[in-house]
């Protein structure tokens, strides 16, 4: 299944940890350990690591250790939303940097904005700098969550919620 996922996404490495993290909390801990071990093996020298949010990535951050590597820079792969700051990419980057003795950057923009607002935001030097770092990341740690739960947290419109339920 990992090979199929690698081929489908055209990526070098994919890892699947057995279990259902919704039913068995220790699965997220195991995912965190596996991710930390993978990072230790793959990261040599200076690296930019883009990180998404969510409870799984928060568990990964808890398993990070200084042995993962030197010269790491963690950047959020997305902005923030809602009030659950603990599971936002900015917070997870901060925790990973703290646990590994590395650096991190933040991206203080909402997840969902209009195209006009996006154009305004990217003109801001600090935001543009972080966006460039995200684009140059040589590793992305991306969680996969339940689309309906994420949409509810983001207070998605009823029309989009109906679409997600149908699909």
Regions from the PLM with identified roles:
Residues 3-37, 41-45, 69-167:
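Ligand-binding beta-strand-loop-alpha-helix segment within the catalytic cores
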Residues 49-59, 82, 146-148:
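Gly/Ser/Thr-rich loops at beta-strand to alpha-helix junctions
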């Amino acid at each position: 299944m990992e090979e199929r996922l690698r081929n489908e996404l055209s990526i070098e490495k994919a890892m699947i940890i057995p279990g259902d993290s919704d039913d068995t909390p220790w699965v997220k801990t195991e995912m965190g350990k596996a991710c930390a071990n993978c990072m230790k093996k793959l990261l040599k020298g200076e690296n930019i690591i883009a990180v998404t949010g969510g409870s799984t990535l928060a568990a990964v951050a808890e398993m990070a250790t200084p042995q993962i590597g030197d010269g790491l820079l963690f950047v959020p792969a997305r902005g923030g939303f809602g009030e659950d700051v603990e599971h936002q990419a900015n917070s997870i980057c901060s925790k990973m940097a703290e646990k590994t003795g590395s650096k991190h950057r933040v991206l203080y923009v909402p997840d969902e904005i209009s195209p006009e607002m996006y154009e305004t935001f990217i003109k801001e030097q600090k935001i543009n700098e972080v966006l460039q770092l995200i684009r140059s990341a040589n590793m992305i740690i991306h969680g996969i969550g339940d689309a309906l739960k994420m949409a509810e947290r983001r207070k998605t419109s009823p029309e989009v919620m109906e679409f997600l339920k149908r699909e």
